[in-house]
Amino acid sequence: MDYQKAILDKVSTGLRLRMLRCKSALTHEDLAGLLQLKSPRVIYDWESGMKIPNAENLYNLALIFNMKMEDLLVMICSF
């Protein structure tokens, strides 16, 4: 049986997060504050594709940017 497997594109997801943050006129510090993160470094790590937000942060990012959680992520389908 053939099926498609979805793989998270961390770099493209990070670029999407950066675009959303900039479009919302938020600094790294602003967004870190809204998410109650200890350091804005986490935002830099997400935007560079080094790390991805956990489920709780994805949920809160979706609320901040007024969109669905799954729309924050960039997925690549492979066979």
Predicted regions mapped to residue ranges:
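A short, Lys/Arg-rich alpha-helix, primarily the initiator
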Residues: 1-23
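DNA major-groove recognition helix of helix-turn-helix
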Residues: 46-47, 57, 76
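DNA major-groove recognition helix of helix-turn-helix/homeodomain DNA-binding modules
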Residues: 56-71
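Short, charged recognition helix plus adjacent turn
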Residues: 1-7, 63, 73-79
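Residues within the helices of the helix-turn-helix
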Residues: 18, 29, 59
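The alpha-helix within a helix-turn-helix
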Residues: 21, 32-33, 62
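Short alpha-helical DNA-recognition segment
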Residues: 25-45
